[in-house]
Structures are given as structure tokens and as C-alpha cells.
């Protein structure tokens, strides 16, 4: 979502609260819970899941391995749920032509650096850089090249932009900031 006037441009950034992350967290949780229940039922010798008799799976080695996969999956699932609840990666980009400043804000993981806030002058922006890699897994990322600080990404690496969309976004950013576009 964007909001733009003649002098101010605010772009809201979606973090980890995406539909795909919710789906993967649910699938991983349910799958790992199933693995853990099968491993536990083979250890106890009881049917905790009524799909098949527990006597078909021996505890050693299949039950131990399934329990291990279930526990590992629950850890990964809890990590995904934590990143979703903390909304890691969300924030905004603020470009203020009137004040001549650019502010980039992102939420991180809990701790000292939970709030990531970058602020610099518009006159320090050298260019908008587009990095395009084609192939089996195409990657199109937009960077803002800043004097003395290097390149700061404006788009996520996992966003799948079409060539037309990334060009449009680069052109809008370069036009608003009045800087050139570089393509790598």
C-alpha cells in the first residue's frame, strides 16, 4: 500500500504476516504433530492415531526417527509462528521531499535492535539500482545506492516481481527522488 502526495511518499512494507507463511506454519505444525503422535503411539503400543495399528511401526528405529522429525518440525513451526506474531520485516519507507530526508523503518526480532530505523538526507542518494538475475529462479531486487553507506534494499528478495513491475517501481522511485537508475 502506498500513499503519495507532491512532496511525501510513504510505502508500507508487508512483513512476515503473509498468507503463504500462515499456510506453511499450519501445514508444518500439523505434519510434525502427526509424526510425533505416530512415534509416541509406537513407543506406548497404543493407537493414538486410528489410521493404522501401532503394531505396524516398531519403536526402534522407525518410531524414534518419526519422533525426532516431529520434535524438529514443532521447533521450526514455533519459529514461524513467532516471526508471524512479531511481524518481522514489516515497516515503511518514507520519502519527504520537503524536509529532504528519507526514513526506512523495519521491525526485527525482539532484543536490543528490534526497531531498525535508518534516516539520511535525500542529497546523499546516488541512484536507484536494479539487480536482475534471470534463470530458473529469477531474482529482481531494487536497491537505493547511498553515498558512504552502500546499497540499501527497497524490495524483499523473495518478492516475485515481473520485469515490468520492477521497472515501474524503479522508475517511480527514481522520478520521485530525482536520481538515475542503474541496472546490474
Swiss-Prot record:
Q: Which residues cross the membrane?
A: 22-42, 57-77
Q: What membrane topology does the UniProt entry give?
A: Multi-pass membrane protein
Which InterPro entries does its entry note?
PSI_Ycf4_assembly (IPR003359)
Q: Report the GO terms under cellular component.
A: chloroplast thylakoid membrane; photosystem I
Please cite one Gene Ontology biological process associated with this protein.
Answer: photosynthesis
For this UniProt record, the keywords arranged alphabetically read as follows: Chloroplast, Membrane, Photosynthesis, Plastid, Thylakoid, Transmembrane, Transmembrane helix
Report the subcellular localization: Plastid, Chloroplast thylakoid membrane
Q: Which family, according to UniProt? A: Belongs to the Ycf4 family.
Describe the task this protein carries out: Seems to be required for the assembly of the photosystem I complex.
Full protein name = Photosystem I assembly protein Ycf4
Tell me the lineage of the source organism: Eukaryota, Viridiplantae, Streptophyta, Embryophyta, Tracheophyta
